[in-house]
From Swiss-Prot:
The gene is pdxT. GO terms for molecular function: glutaminase activity; pyridoxal 5'-phosphate synthase (glutamine hydrolysing) activity. Pathway: Cofactor biosynthesis; pyridoxal 5'-phosphate biosynthesis. L-glutamine binds at G48, E49, S50, R109, I137, R138. It comes from Mycobacteroides abscessus (strain ATCC 19977 / DSM 44196 / CCUG 20993 / CIP 104536 / JCM 13569 / NCTC 13031 / TMC 1543 / L948). This is Pyridoxal 5'-phosphate synthase subunit PdxT. The keyword Lyase applies. NCBIfam families: PLP_synth_Pdx2. It comes from the Bacteria. Belongs to the glutaminase PdxT/SNO family. HAMAP family: PdxT (MF_01615). GO terms for biological process: glutamine catabolic process; pyridoxal phosphate biosynthetic process; pyridoxine metabolic process.
Amino acid sequence: MSPLVGVLALQGDVREHVAALKDSGAEALGVRRPEELGKVDGLVIPGGESTTMSNLLRVFELLDPLTERLRAGLPVYGSCAGMILLASEILDTRPDAVALGAIDMTVRRNAFGRQVDSFEGDLDFTGVDGAMHAVFIRAPWVERVGDDVEVLASAQGHPVAVRQGSALATAFHPEVTGDRRVHQLFVDMVRAG
C-alpha cells in the first residue's frame, strides 16, 4: 500500500512536490488544516518564504498540531524554506519566526544571497548513485549540526542536505529538476517509519 504523504499547502511550490511524491510511489495530500495533518504518514514542507510560512502556520492553527506530530516521530522533509522551519536555530530571521526543532541544526536564511544570486550545480549526495543536480533559490545553508545529524551533501563548504532520524532537509529544490531521488529517499523513510 502506498503511504499518504502530505505537502504543507500554505505557500510555496506545493504542486511540484505533489507530482514528485506521486512519481515516487506515494499518495499525496495538500495539508491546510489540522485534520488533514492528522491523516498523513509523512509531511513535506516546501520551499517558499519561511517567515510567511511561520505566520501562516499560526493563522491556520497548524503550529501546535505539527509540533506534536513531529515530536511523536512523523517523518518530515523540508526543502529550502522547509529546511529553515525544521531547524532548531535560525539566523538572519525575524524574532517571531518558527523553528520547529525537528533537526538539531543552525540554519542561515538566504545565505547564498538574493534572488539574483540563485544558482544551479551538481552535488555528491550520500546514499544516491551519481551526481545530483541542485537548484538553489535564495537558499539557506547549515552553519552547525548536532552530533546525531548526518550531512548528506555540501556546497561551497556548507551542508545543504541533512538527515536526523525521520527528518530530512535540503537547501535546494529537487522538486523542480525532475530528479526524484530525494523524494524517493523520503518516501522510503516514510515506509520504514
